[in-house]
Curated annotation (Swiss-Prot):
UniProt function note: Inhibits the supercoiling activity of DNA gyrase. Acts by inhibiting DNA gyrase at an early step, prior to (or at the step of) binding of DNA by the gyrase. It protects cells against toxins that target DNA gyrase, by inhibiting activity of these toxins and reducing the formation of lethal double-strand breaks in the cell.
GO MF term (any one): DNA topoisomerase type II (double strand cut, ATP-hydrolyzing) inhibitor activity
Entry similarity comment: Belongs to the DNA gyrase inhibitor family.
Gene3D superfamilies: Regulatory factor, effector binding domain
GO terms under cellular component: cytoplasm
Complex formation: Interacts with DNA gyrase.
Subcellular location: Cytoplasm
Name listed for the protein in its UniProt record: DNA gyrase inhibitor
């Protein structure tokens, strides 16, 4: 899979932190997020899922993720937003790849991306969360176009 290296600034995010198998929690979290954004007219700049763990090292029932929207740095969570967190995704260097997801199979493009990235002799995966940005409404379109971001650091030569 082709990817590029890009430097991103910090992203302020608001949404829901969930624990459990990602194939269940992300879908549930996105549904919660959509209702919250609509009910509170949240000025969402981007829609993201943030992944905090390595599924090869952490049992599925303990996997952490957040379904969030990017908001302005000074955003204040509105009243009656039970369970909503305000956090940040760290800035820095990221490997970025675009993929189309069909049949809710988000795992396959991520595995292909990591397979390509792990072959790099210039960059290695950094110990920070990965995330994906949704470029369209997959529930409406029948597929999702996503940009996947993996934090990286240059390998010392």
């Amino acid at each position: 899979m082709n990817y590029s290296i890009t430097t991103l600034g910090k992203k302020t995010i608001a949404g829901f932190h969930l624990v459990g198998p990602w194939d269940q929690t992300v879908k549930q979290g996105v549904e919660q997020l959509m209702m919250w954004v609509e009910n509170h007219q949240v000025p969402a700049r981007e829609w993201l899922a943030v992944y905090y763990d390595n599924p090869e090292e952490v049992p599925a029932e303990k996997l952490r993720c957040a379904t969030v929207v990017a908001v302005d740095e000074d955003y204040v969570i509105p009243a009656n937003s039970e369970g909503v967190i305000l956090a940040a995704v760290a800035g820095g260097d990221y490997a970025c790849a675009r993929a189309r997801v069909v049949d809710y199979d988000f795992a396959t493009p991520w595995m292909q991306f990591f397979d390509s990235l792990l072959q790099s002799t210039t960059y290695r995966v950094a110990p920070r969360p990965c995330f994906e940005i949704y470029l369209n409404d997959g529930n409406h379109d029948g597929y999702w176009d996503i940009d996947m971001y993996v934090p990286v650091e240059r390998v010392a030569s």
